[in-house]
Regions:
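Alpha-helix capping and helix-loop boundary segments enriched in small/acidic/polar residues
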Residues: 26, 79, 83-86, 110-113
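Catalytic-core regions built around general acid/base machinery
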Residues: 38, 91, 95-102
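Short beta-strand/turn micro-motifs composed of small residues
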Residues: 54-55, 110
């Protein structure tokens, strides 16, 4: 199974690739957590000069949060939003805040569908 996010450092550049092209690179909680950790690493490493984010595939940069999966989880549990769904949105907004205040250049290679949380992780 492919990783849903690919994080690497090449030539002093942090590179984030959202790797869920079959889901238009929609964000999961795992992606949000890994992006948060990677941005912390990049910001605190003087050898890293900037960060680039891109989406895999040809249709989308990022369609936002994977609300289909969150909806299914809520329906499966038969009630109001779960702790995980609330934590997802809380942490995703914190990620947007981190990107907004990031101390190094943050470059989004937007190509294709970009909406909701995709806008947040691309240009906050």
């Amino acid at each position: 199974m492919n990783e849903e996010i690919i994080l690497k450092i090449e030539n002093s550049v942090g590179i984030i690739t959202l790797n869920r092209p079959e889901r238009l690179n929609a964000l999961t909680y795992n992606i949000v957590q890994k992006m948060n950790d990677f941005l912390d690493k990049c910001e605190n490493d003087d050898d890293i000069k900037c960060v680039i984010i891109e989406g895999a595939g040809e249709k989308a940069f990022c369609a936002g949060g994977d609300v289909v999966s969150l909806r299914k989880q809520v329906l499966d549990e038969g009630g109001p939003p779960t702790e995980l769904s609330e934590k997802f949105f809380y942490d995703e907004y914190l990620l947007n805040y981190k990107i907004n205040n990031f101390k190094k250049p943050y470059i989004a290679l937007i190509d294709g569908v970009t909406m909701g949380g995709g806008v947040g992780v691309s240009m906050h």
